[in-house]
Amino acid sequence: MAKNTNITTVADNRKARFSYEVIDTLEAGLVLSGTEVKSLREGHANIQESYAAVEGGEIWLINSHIPEYFAGNRFNHEPRRRRKLLLSKKEMARLAQAVEREGMTMVPLKLYFNERGIAKLLLAIARGKKLHDKRETLKQRDWSREQARLLKERG
C-alpha cells in the first residue's frame, strides 16, 4: 500500500474556534484499536463535543465519537470510549499546569492522518469566550464578508 504524501483530515472542530480563544496548539498521538483506525480511514469521526482532561497523570480524550467499523464483527470498539493521548512528560506537565492554575481548557481542533499515515490530534489550550466576545467575532466576520463583496463588485 502506497503511503499518503499529504495530511488527510478526518474530523474538524470548527465550533471550537468560535467558542474558545485559542492560546496554543500542539500535536498529540492517540492510542487506538484496529477497528478505530479503519473507521477513521473511512472518514468517520466526530470531535464536536469532545474535550481532553488530565486524570492520573495522563491526558485523555473524552466524549469523542468514532463509529464502529462496519466489518468489525465481535472485535469492534466502543464508539464513545475514552482514548489516551500520547504526549511527552514535559508537554503533559505544561498542559496540566495551564488547566489547573490558569483555568484553561484543552479542546481538540482537528483529527487527521499525518504524512506517515499515523492518526494525530491537534489539541488546543484555550480560554472560553464570553458572549460579547462571540458577538464581536460575528461582527468582524460579517464585516470581512461585506468588504470582500464590495471589492468584488468594484472590480
Swiss-Prot record:
Gene Ontology molecular functions? RNA binding
Q: Which UniProt keywords apply?
A: Cytoplasm, RNA-binding
Location of the protein in the cell: Cytoplasm
Major place of residence = cytoplasm
Task: List all disulphide bridges recorded for this chain.
Answer: none
Q: Name a GO CC annotation attached to this entry.
A: cytosol
Fetch the CDD domains from UniProt. Answer: SmpB
- Which GO BP terms apply? trans-translation
Tell me the Pfam families matching this sequence.
Answer: SmpB
Q: Which InterPro entries does the record associate with it?
A: SmpB, SsrA-bd_prot, SsrA-bd_prot_CS
What this protein is reported to do is described as: Required for rescue of stalled ribosomes mediated by trans-translation. Binds to transfer-messenger RNA (tmRNA), required for stable association of tmRNA with ribosomes. tmRNA and SmpB together mimic tRNA shape, replacing the anticodon stem-loop with SmpB. tmRNA is encoded by the ssrA gene; the 2 termini fold to resemble tRNA(Ala) and it encodes a 'tag peptide', a short internal open reading frame. During trans-translation Ala-aminoacylated tmRNA acts like a tRNA, entering the A-site of stalled ribosomes, displacing the stalled mRNA.
Q: Record's family?
A: Belongs to the SmpB family.
PANTHER family annotated for this entry? SSRA-BINDING PROTEIN, TMRNA-BINDING COMPONENT OF TRANS-TRANSLATION TAGGING COMPLEX
Name listed for the protein in its UniProt record: SsrA-binding protein
Which source organism? Chelativorans sp. (strain BNC1)
- What gene is this protein a product of? smpB
